[in-house]
Amino acid sequence: MDVPTSSTDSQEVKPIMPIRTKAACKFYPPHILCGKGAKTNKRGKRGGAQKASTKKDIGETTPPVAKKSKVAKEPTMLAAAAAPEAAASPESSAAAAAPEAAASPESSAAAAAPEAAASPESSAAAAAPEAAASLESSAAAAAPEAAAAPATPAAPEAAAAPEVAAAPATPAAPEATAAPAAPEAATTPAAPEAPAAAPAVEEEEMVWEAAAVVGEAAVKPPEEEPTSGEAVATTTMT
């Protein structure tokens, strides 16, 4: 009876020893398993390793918080930098539009003055209604094109309009050729500005009536006039 018990005790003790040294130390404190030898056990080293790992984890977790705060500050700096730019852009656009608006009536008036002075008012008064209707259609058709076109190319056209209008007015052919070229130069600077569009169109209609009277007196075919073709094309597109 004693021998089997001793054999069983020896069999039970053998598997407990490796568990005490390797696996059991992970789940039980060292003073229960190892007793006095707790100081020399690996548990202390593992505890130190765990403490170091916890410190590393703490060190790894803190920098992302600082990075998030920096990222949160960067959009505010970008927004603060974009605010003055956005505030300056309307001013620059308004400042750029102001000289154009100021120059467009002057250029249109300068282009209209020589034509009004050169056109004879006493010729063909019966053709005025037809000329007024054609001018209204051409001005209405040219308005969207002038609004879509940029303001920079309109400046050379406006500058070239007085030169074309200042041509010698003795023969009737130069006046007829200057009449179709003038509407584009006069409508383009006036159309981009909404407030100045209405009075400019009214003045242009008066000028084009006189120019159309001169063109009809010269009996020039409509195919040679570019404005008539453009007006028909734009009306069909609209």
Curated annotation (Swiss-Prot):
Region of interest (Disordered), ranges: 35-238
Highest taxon above the source species: Eukaryota
Bias kind Low complexity: ranges: 79-200, 208-220
Region named 4 X 6 AA repeats of P-A-A-P-E-A: 153-194
GO annotation (BP), single: spermatid development
Biased composition annotated in UniProt, kind: Basic residues: 39-48
Region (4 X 15 AA tandem repeats of A-A-A-A-A-P-E-A-A-A-S-[PL]-E-S-S) location: 79-148
GO cellular component: cytoplasm; male germ cell nucleus; nucleoplasm; nucleus
Tissue distribution of the protein: Specifically expressed in testis (at protein level).
Protein name: Testis-specific gene A8 protein
Organism: Mus musculus
Gene coding for it: Tsga8
